[in-house]
Amino acid sequence: MAVYNYDVVVLGSGPAGEGAAMNAAKAGRKVAMVDDRRQVGGNCTHLGTIPSKALRHSVRQIMQFNTNPMFRAIGEPRWFSFPDVLKSAEKVIAKQVASRTGYYARNRVDVFVGTGSFADEQTVEVVCPNGVVEKLNAKHIIIATGSRPYRPADIDFHHPRVYDSDTILSLSHTPRKLIVYGAGVIGCEYASIFSGLGVLVELVDNRGQLLSFLDSEISQALSYHFSNNNITVRHNEEYERVEGLDNGVILHLKSGKKIKADALLWCNGRTGNTDKLGLENIGIKVNSRGQIEVDEAYRTTVPNIYGAGDVIGWPSLASAAHDQGRSAAGSIVDNGSWRFVNDVPTGIYTIPEISSIGKNEQELTQAKVPYEVGKAFFKSMARAQIAGEPQGMLKILFHRETLEILGVHCFGYQASEIVHIGQAIMNQPGEQNNLKYFVNTTFNYPTMAEAYRVAAYDGLNRLF
């Protein structure tokens, strides 16, 4: 058994692991990374964020081709199969792996391929693919092993027509009708993708409103758009059982309803990847979803062991995971890079996309904050008209008296990009966070960014 000594060992090479390893390495620490894949990037690169967003981009291009009058004049709408569209995503994955492999090489981070588990509080044993065991001793260890789809024991995920958000990327045909169980972020994104390919989608939601954490107006806009695009949303429903057929599936609901489709995509929750870490050897406990509890420094109950990313739960975003990993390493190297990541923009890549930051109307009303609203509808924006993307709006919530921006919510074309302008102003200290910034700033024309000026004027006109 080979033995190696490090300052920091990072378990997992997804966004959290990458952020942690890079920060520690740049602070002069000797760093090792352990991942069970031969290629770095974690689930984000191989099964989650990157392939699904690349897939979405390709589907959106197909939708534009099939609905744009100029292209329709050339010929009839084209049909593309799911496997064909997926090929473009595979190219992006390869490029991402190459980039990230280069990061670790340039920063002299040693990458170990294998399954890592704790022998004790300062030792990780790595079982390599060839069966060889290597021992890594470290002063500090960061757990960033991510998560995987939650799989109820009573559902047969080995059935060829039953998928989760990982295995859906191996779908070898294009279903005519698809059931998506779970209307969270992942479920809504895949419902949009398959709808864009002309698939009839049944989206089953166990709550009364889509993405209820969003501003209610944005949630309602998404529901309306879904209803116009071959997506039937069934609220307040729970599954009783899943019946697999030779040519499809039947979803039995507790309400007594039955839904038949060519395939089922299960998108109801995630489970932390902690079951193979040997946490029982060091006294770290996990919750019912396999997640680790950490403090504001991302430290677990064992002082030299930290956690970051999906493995610690909320908010389970790639963007937040990277910052959490970087902050966990910052707690170790004490280079001023630590911060508790609690206010990050939400990006939801439905078609159209959604993004938000800060408070929504429900929260401000409940807190009895005197706020006002400013809106800019994309159908009136020159850039949106040029792009043929009239759906959507930008919504700014601000304090009636101080004009402090309290929340930014966007639905439509480039929403995940637009939100960062509002985020930047909201993070300014004191009176610099002010709605009038958007009135007094010159925006390029035509751009989607100038929606901020339109929304600011709209909001100021509501004051009296």
From Swiss-Prot:
Keywords: Cytoplasm, FAD, Flavoprotein, NAD, NADP, Oxidoreductase. It catalyses: NAD(+) + NADPH = NADH + NADP(+). It is found in: Cytoplasm. This is Soluble pyridine nucleotide transhydrogenase. GO terms for cellular component: cytosol. Its cofactor is FAD. FAD binds at D35, D36, R37, R38, Q39, V40, G41, G42, N43, C44. InterPro entries: Class-I_Pyr_Nuc-Dis_Oxidored, FAD/NAD-bd_sf, FAD/NAD-binding_dom, FAD/NAD-linked_Rdtase_dimer_sf, Pyr_nuc-diS_OxRdtase, Pyr_nucl-diS_OxRdtase_dimer, STH_gammaproteobact. Its EC number is 1.6.1.1. GO terms for molecular function: dihydrolipoyl dehydrogenase (NADH) activity; flavin adenine dinucleotide binding; NAD(P)+ transhydrogenase (Si-specific) activity. Conversion of NADPH, generated by peripheral catabolic pathways, to NADH, which can enter the respiratory chain for energy generation. Signal peptide: none annotated. Its main location: cytoplasm. The keyword Oxidoreductase applies. Belongs to the class-I pyridine nucleotide-disulfide oxidoreductase family. Gene3D superfamilies: 3.30.390.30, FAD/NAD(P)-binding domain (3.50.50.60). NCBIfam families: PRK05249.1. Pfam families: Pyr_redox_2, Pyr_redox_dim.
